[in-house]
Amino acid sequence: MTQKIRTRFAPSPTGFIHLGNIRSALYPWAFARATGGDFILRIEDTDVERSSQAAVDVIIEGMRWLGLDHDEGPFYQMQRMDRYKAVLAEMQAAGQVYPCYMSVAELDALREKQMAAKEKPRYDGTWRPEPGKTLPPIPAGVQPVLRFKNPQGGSVVWDDKVKGRIEISNDELDDLVIARPDGTPTYNFCVVVDDIDMAITHVIRGDDHVNNTPRQINIFRALGKDVPVYAHLPTVLNEQGEKMSKRNGAKPVTQYAAEGYLPDAMVNYLARLGWSHGDDEIFSREQFLKWFNLDHLGKSAAQFDEAKLRWVNAQHLKATADDKLAELVQPFLAARGVGLDTARMVGGCGLFKDRCSTLVELADWLQLLVTGGQPSAQDISTHVTEAVRPALGKLADALVACEWSKAAIAAAIKQVLAETGLKMPQLAMAVRVLVMGTPQTPSLDAILELMKREDVISRLKI
């Protein structure tokens, strides 16, 4: 029977989650969904001083907004300490770990000596028990760390789904600290126990973890467990070519929601930020999941481009049904205290969406249907001329009695043009400036139909 795919996203809740982080959630989520597998959310919160529940909430909120639903979790490492300590005890009984009493000062002195000799700084195995070896006397009052007995000789080899075959000599790896003096386990050990207990089959994560992988593989093997498949994703760079980070100006994922980006557009953009399906640039979530596999993950660092993100978002806005857009934009209007009935909101979405890159821009247009805009002095002087003013009064009078429909409004405009001899652009530009605050709008009769009759008439009577 084919083994069920199980992937995970395991962030540390030490700050907000940005686009580089969330891409490391998108791909394992997509792989699980594309293969009928399970996606697990795990919170690696062992850094107690820096971790916070607020950061966890932001992570979950960002994933929920993007629709990256998890099948199991969230699991918290701090709630699994008893399990880690039980496995540590088993390994200690099997002679796979040992206590090390070397002090921080002794380790620092060792590193300085190695660096002076142009050697790689590493633990030298002073306290590693070996047949026939005499260990130093145990110092009084010192709580030891526990170190993992890394294999000596040979190498660790794995076929990375992004980077290809990777081989690391065990001679390059020292004996890893897997428990601190107070008994709390360290990151690399906890990760392995979690991946075993949660039956993770594929670890898809950033390539800043590549150096951890051989150490983790050796712990898997010491515990007699199968090693998962690894895929280490290249770094996401910001627009300046630096690694994306809070320090370098990255924004929280949730800020993009507030700026009016669509979740499916963000998934589309992030998917392309390290994966490809031929030349396809715009695709739905369903298409992405149909196409996604690990074979087309990029090997080079991807660079974030906000202008490209806005373009992708604009394409998704245009493709979204008007009634769905109305649902999405309504909270943006409500936050401004702007009330617009559903029918007019749906109609406005159809009129304006081709002019917008975000929901915020769409809300800007829809708001004008209610509040009008403040025209510039330049637009007034250019378009609302003495030659046009009489026609504006005639149009206001005609609109008082006519049916409030696009066809009737168009007929009223046509009648005023016939009576005054004006050309359509002369009258239309003036009306747009007065009722919407800008000479650049969609079809005038369609715009006026979506506005309240009394608002239009009052703005035309100057």
UniProtKB/Swiss-Prot annotation:
One of the record's GO cellular component terms: cytosol
Q: Name its cellular compartments.
A: Cytoplasm
Q: Motif 'HIGH' region: which residue numbers? A: 11-21
- Domain of life according to the entry: Bacteria
| Basic and acidic residues biased stretches | 120-131
Q: What is its EC number?
A: 6.1.1.17
List UniProt keywords, sorted A-Z.
Aminoacyl-tRNA synthetase, ATP-binding, Cytoplasm, Ligase, Nucleotide-binding, Protein biosynthesis
Any one Pfam family here would be Anticodon_2
Catalysis performed (reactions): tRNA(Glu) + L-glutamate + ATP = L-glutamyl-tRNA(Glu) + AMP + diphosphate
Q: Which GO terms describe its biological process?
A: glutamyl-tRNA aminoacylation
Q: Where is this region: Disordered?
A: 120-140
Q: Recorded GO terms, molecular function?
A: ATP binding; glutamate-tRNA ligase activity; tRNA binding; zinc ion binding
Task: Identify the InterPro entries for this entry.
Answer: aa-tRNA-synth_I_cd-bd, aa-tRNA-synth_I_codon-bd_sub2, aa-tRNA-synth_I_CS, aa_tRNA-synth_I_cd-bd_sf, Glu-tRNA-ligase_bac/mito, Glu/Gln-tRNA-synth, Glu/Gln-tRNA-synth_Ib_cat-dom, GluQ/Sye
Quote the record's binding site residues for ATP. K246
In which residues does the motif 'KMSKS' region occur?
243-247
Please give the function described in this protein's UniProt entry. Answer: Catalyzes the attachment of glutamate to tRNA(Glu) in a two-step reaction: glutamate is first activated by ATP to form Glu-AMP and then transferred to the acceptor end of tRNA(Glu).
Q: Family per UniProt?
A: Belongs to the class-I aminoacyl-tRNA synthetase family. Glutamate--tRNA ligase type 1 subfamily.
Could you describe the subunit structure of this protein? Answer: Monomer.
Q: What is this protein called?
A: Glutamate--tRNA ligase
